[in-house]
């Protein structure tokens, strides 16, 4: 099959690369190309395969976390480091079709469509790592432990499915852990991010009072997608939110603590909950002059947290039950995420550029491996 990869032109012969393209991601040149991948062998008689399945990736998408991995791989290739590989695959969300099953697999069948189950932090099987299932969804073929995928319903299309797992599992966990009351006022920061979008849509489905904070202009269609949430725009790089009339909230969801934590804390009510699942500057090249990452307000922040009995919660992905719940609540008429663009394998640069360089992007960019 044809698969998209970051390619090392110093190590991979030109004849092995089709549709070579270059794009810039925050100052790093990333070279993408299409390579041939053969179906891996899978011996169902081998006991080592008993609890595993072989999956053909039908479509995949990238998350913010993949950006740093892509940039790091490209930097290694560009600097000709000895540890650089000929190709580097990427992508952590996918939908795939099971093509082979091991003898010990009972709940999954050949032909089933599945998505990754990134359960964390609790182990479900000895020797099977928790957390993100793969960083190489673009490889096209994946051999995975049976616990690391879940089947999806027919009414979830491939494009939503390829964008679903990490955002849905993370948002489901964050909402569960905040013990939200029906009267709580909720703020979601960086609201165009994929995780924030999942959070907003899930909260609205339950009837909560949601305010979404953004630094971008939204179209009417985009505002309609999150209605009746109140969308408030602030200037990008604003050092303090004191000059805007935000008010107070009982719960604040924030995907980027290094950008927003210091400004969030003063806007929490007594016994308020702040929860975060990540940070923006996962690589030094991601840092911008307008980022407010001051540490000299830390003492004031902790004083406010102590005086007001605040809860500061860190969240990493979620449990299997969190993902099962998100799948069970999925409504094709009210999807939790928009699909911004769908491209095929021969549009690798467009896929990466749209995913990471377009501030106007609203939702996920999906690459399909289906004809």
Put a short name on every predicted segment.
Residues 43-61, 74-123:
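Glycine-rich beta-strand-centered segment in the early N-terminal region that forms part
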Residues 206-208, 259-336, 368-371:
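Glycine-rich phosphate-binding loop and adjacent beta-alpha segment
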Residues 84, 92, 117-190:
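NAD(P)H dinucleotide-binding glycine-rich loop of Rossmann-like/cofactor-binding domains
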Residues 115, 252-253:
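N-terminal Rossmann-like NAD(P) cofactor-binding module of classical short-chain dehydrogenase/reductase
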Residues 237-247:
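Short amphipathic alpha-helix with an adjacent loop that forms part of the alpha/beta core around
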Residues 162-238:
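Mid-domain Rossmann-like dinucleotide-binding core that forms the NAD(H)/NADP(H) cofactor-binding site
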């Amino acid at each position: 099959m044809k698969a998209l990869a970051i390619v090392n032109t110093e190590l991979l012969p030109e004849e092995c690369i089709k549709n070579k393209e270059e794009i810039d991601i925050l100052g790093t040149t990333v070279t993408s190309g299409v390579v041939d991948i053969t179906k891996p062998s899978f011996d169902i008689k081998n006991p080592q395969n008993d609890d595993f399945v072989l999956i053909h990736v039908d479509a995949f998408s990238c998350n913010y976390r993949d950006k740093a991995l892509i940039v790091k791989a490209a930097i290694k290739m560009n600097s000709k480091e000895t540890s650089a590989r000929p190709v580097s695959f990427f992508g952590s969300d996918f939908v795939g079709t099971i093509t082979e099953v091991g003898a010990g697999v009972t709940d999954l069948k050949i032909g089933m469509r599945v998505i990754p189950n990134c359960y964390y932090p609790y182990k479900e099987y000895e020797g099977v790592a928790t957390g993100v299932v793969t960083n190489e969804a673009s490889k096209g073929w994946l051999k995975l432990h049976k616990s690391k995928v879940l089947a999806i319903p027919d009414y979830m299309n491939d494009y939503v499915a390829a964008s679903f797992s990490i955002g849905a599992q993370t948002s489901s966990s964050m909402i569960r852990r905040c013990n939200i009351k029906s009267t709580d006022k909720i703020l979601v920061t960086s609201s165009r991010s994929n995780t924030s979008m999942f959070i907003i849509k899930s909260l609205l489905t339950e009837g909560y009072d949601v305010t979404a904070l953004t630094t971008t202009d939204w179209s009417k269609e985009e505002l309609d997608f999150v209605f009746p949430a109140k969308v408030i725009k602030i200037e990008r790089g604003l050092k303090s939110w004191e000059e805007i009339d935000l008010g107070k909230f009982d719960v604040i969801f924030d995907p980027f603590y290094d950008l927003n934590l210091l400004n969030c804390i003063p806007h929490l009510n007594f016994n308020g909950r702040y929860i975060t699942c990540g940070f923006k500057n996962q690589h030094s090249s991601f840092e911008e002059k307008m980022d407010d990452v001051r540490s000299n307000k830390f003492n004031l922040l902790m004083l406010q947290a102590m005086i007001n009995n605040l809860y500061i919660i860190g969240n990493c992905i979620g449990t299997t039950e969190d993902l099962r719940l998100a799948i069970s609540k999925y409504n094709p008429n009210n999807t939790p995420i928009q699909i911004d663009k769908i491209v095929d394998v021969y549009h690798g640069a467009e896929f990466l550029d749209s995913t990471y360089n377009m501030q106007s992007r609203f939702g996920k960019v999906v690459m399909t491996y289906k004809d």
